[in-house]
Amino acid sequence: MIVIACLDDNGGMMFNHRRQSQDRVLWAHIAALVGDARLWMNHYSAQQFDAESIQHLNVDDAFLQEAVDGDYCFVEDAALAPFERWIEKIIIFRWHRTYPADQHFDIDLSGGNWKICESVEFTGHSHERISMEVYLR
């Protein structure tokens, strides 16, 4: 599976059961990135996406158990460490801001198992700068 996650400067993902931030330009970027591949997410995350813009949108609260090689998984509020051995690529979108957080990204990207292979910046709607970092094993 290919994981997509949005993180603040401290690796935060959620605070008080809510996403830290969102950006409609980012949603369009994710739709283009996924193309005609399957994109999995839970019901909470699906609320922010336009199902018509993503051809193969799959919504299931157990989506990390359903995804197979080559499938994308948009993750906001799930622990990923238990699934790390099945993850082939990680795509991180960074907000370049610090938000309150009580749930953090739980895979160590600096520990040597993952190497950054691409980094791109773009301007969002509500964020002056969003970075996309792609990590491979």
PLM regions: where:
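Enzymes that bind and transform nitrogen-containing heteroaromatic metabolites
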Residues: M1-R137
